């Protein structure tokens, strides 16, 4: 996947647990885990907005374009 979700890094920097973030944002821990493991295929803007609000970050802090591995 060429988009990486830096949720782990932001949680560590903010000394926040995944369960605390889930409660604040109103998303299940299971869905946040999918994001954290880079297995999500999409994210709603409302979810991205809520994550950025609670983590006090910009979308670019949370999402990173890593490029394709198979580029020639």
For the regions a protein language model found, what residue spans apply to each?
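Short, charged recognition helix plus adjacent turn
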Residues: 9, 34, 63-72
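Short, basic-rich loop-to-helix N-cap that marks the start of a DNA-contacting helix
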Residues: 39-50
């Amino acid at each position: 996947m060429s988009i990486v979700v830096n949720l782990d890094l932001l949680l560590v920097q903010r000394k926040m647990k995944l369960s605390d973030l889930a409660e604040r944002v109103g998303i299940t821990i299971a869905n946040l885990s999918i994001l954290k493991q880079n297995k999500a295929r999409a994210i709603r803007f409302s979810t991205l907005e809520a994550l950025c609000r609670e983590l006090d970050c910009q979308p670019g802090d949370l999402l990173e374009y890593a490029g394709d591995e198979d580029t020639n």
